[in-house]
């Protein structure tokens, strides 16, 4: 794809609004082609390395299925399956894998790791998730939003992110808003707002593209008129229990529930979540949260909202694969 060949995909602000739109158009075409049985394999003979320092269901499956659909072969390197950063430096790993593979996906820790891989690999490197950014998720989110509001351009859409915005999702949403002109509202306690420097940079770009970025602690004001309400988990199994209590106390008022959905004043408002979600007590962590903190029926989102007609989370999950396929096709085929 012209302009993308052999480029890396590390964070959204590495691209222009036009380039982002091109990727979304390609993803929509690839999705339609797959569903109609007309998909053309562009990556036959390509070999792809998938480095996972953090496990994932959606990201791994998306890359693997997308690669297979396009005729490529993959090697999965899990948390215990490589020496990256332990017995071998990131720089050396990049140079080794770059001699064997046509593209490398990295999902793990610091953004500096994926940046180093990109610097030394000599082949396209794709960010499947770092502590700072999650660009492939936002591609899927944007495609899903387009599908559910086909008559509206992004600069006429309002997206609310409720909960903990001081993470890779909050950062990548800022970048997405900067490029698309979304009306993005981060509705969260001030302690959970993203870094001020990134907010300032993205707000200036968003305004140039017809959008706006708002940070507020006021739930009612923040969600008014929203087209989409998005949230993510508050805690993870890797965090100390003391953190759980602190985070839950801080974020309880930002749970996405039927009241918050009604406060939008929009009967057509849709619910988004990057998954996995703790919406019931049917998981190990969900059960612990219910028992220890009384969070029966959901943590960051209630089961009622998650299972409602407003929930489009599984459209999002499917679109991870189509948008990731677009990234690989764009960067590996001329």
UniProtKB/Swiss-Prot annotation:
Keywords of the record: Amino-acid biosynthesis, Arginine biosynthesis, Cytoplasm, Transferase
One matching Pfam family: OTCace
Enzyme Commission code(s) on record: 2.1.3.3
One GO biological process term: citrulline biosynthetic process
Amino acids binding L-ornithine: 168, 232, 236-237
Gene3D superfamilies assigned to the protein according to its UniProt record, in alphabetical order: Aspartate/ornithine carbamoyltransferase
Main location: cytoplasm
SUPFAM superfamilies hit by this protein: Aspartate/ornithine carbamoyltransferase
Protein location: Cytoplasm
InterPro entries documented for this protein: Asp/Orn_carbamoyltranf_P-bd, Asp/Orn_carbamoylTrfase, Asp/Orn_carbamoylTrfase_sf, Asp_carbamoyltransf_Asp/Orn-bd, Orn/put_carbamltrans, OTCase_ArgI
Record-level Gene Ontology MF annotations: amino acid binding; ornithine carbamoyltransferase activity
Free-text function comment from the UniProt entry: Reversibly catalyzes the transfer of the carbamoyl group from carbamoyl phosphate (CP) to the N(epsilon) atom of ornithine (ORN) to produce L-citrulline.
Family note: Belongs to the aspartate/ornithine carbamoyltransferase superfamily. OTCase family.
Record-given protein name: Ornithine carbamoyltransferase
Organism: Escherichia coli O157:H7
Gene field: argI
